[in-house]
């Protein structure tokens, strides 16, 4: 592993173990056993390092969302996408938090972050365009995509924070939550309000 990649991995460890507020290039260097100046060859500031960590999280997320076979049924594809979203949130909590709960760093790499975030969102937009029966996104497609995203984000937040463990919900409810939510979304999209 080269020093740049090692710095990114060490940064992820710092964030996971101590929190993002404790991330520093000096701590990364100490963890790697290199001089305090070594990480600066690849990352001029802490913000640049954080931007690279987030960039890799978004790339991993986009790849995860695209890791599904496309079918001829856009509603089935939307359902699968919802399951993949939740699966990523629960199986990669650090990356999920970094993408959706961390203010974006003001670094030169912010353009890459924007491209990565759009790549992940475009996966949803393309499926939503198919649900709408159009070839490219329209304002209605984007509104519905934001609705689906915010719904899945809310469910992911509730489940990842274990908010439901203290409720008297049966294991069946937990098991069927995603399918139920995606079913309601599908019905709502079949009968749009506007």
Regions from the PLM with identified roles:
Residues 107-114, 118, 131-182, 192-194:
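Hydrophobic/aromatic-rich alpha-helical bundle segments in the mid-to-C-terminal region
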Residues 15, 49-57, 99, 116:
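Alpha-helical DNA-contacting segments of helix-turn-helix folds
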Residues 10-18, 60-71, 151-158:
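Solvent-exposed, amphipathic alpha-helical segments
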Residues 6, 10, 14-48, 52:
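Helix-turn-helix
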Residues 1-2, 13, 191-194:
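N-terminal intrinsically disordered/low-complexity leader segments
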Residues 52, 66-95, 117-119, 138, ...:
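Hydrophobic alpha-helical connector segments
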Residues 24, 97-100, 107-108, 167-168:
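Short, hydrophobic secondary-structure boundary micro-motifs
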């Amino acid at each position: 592993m080269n020093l740049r990649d090692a710095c990114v991995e060490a940064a992820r460890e710092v964030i996971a173990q101590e929190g993002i507020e404790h991330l520093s290039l000096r701590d990364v260097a100490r963890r790697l056993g290199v001089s305090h100046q070594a990480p600066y060859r690849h990352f001029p500031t802490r913000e640049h390092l954080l931007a690279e960590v987030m960039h890799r999280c978004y790339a991993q997320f986009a790849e995860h969302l695209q890791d599904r076979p496309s079918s001829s049924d856009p509603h089935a594809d939307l359902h699968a996408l919802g399951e993949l979203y939740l699966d990523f949130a629960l199986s990669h909590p650090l990356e999920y938090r970094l993408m959706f709960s961390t203010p974006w760093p003001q670094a030169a790499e912010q353009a890459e972050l924007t491209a990565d975030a759009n790549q992940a969102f475009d996966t949803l937009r393309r499926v939503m365009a198919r649900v709408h029966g159009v070839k490219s996104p329209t304002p209605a497609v984007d509104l519905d995509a934001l609705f689906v995203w915010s719904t899945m984000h809310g469910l992911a937040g509730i489940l990842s924070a274990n908010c439901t463990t203290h409720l008297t919900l049966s294991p069946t409810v937990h098991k069927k939550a995603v399918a139920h939510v995606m079913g309601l979304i599908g019905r709502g999209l079949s009968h749009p309000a506007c």
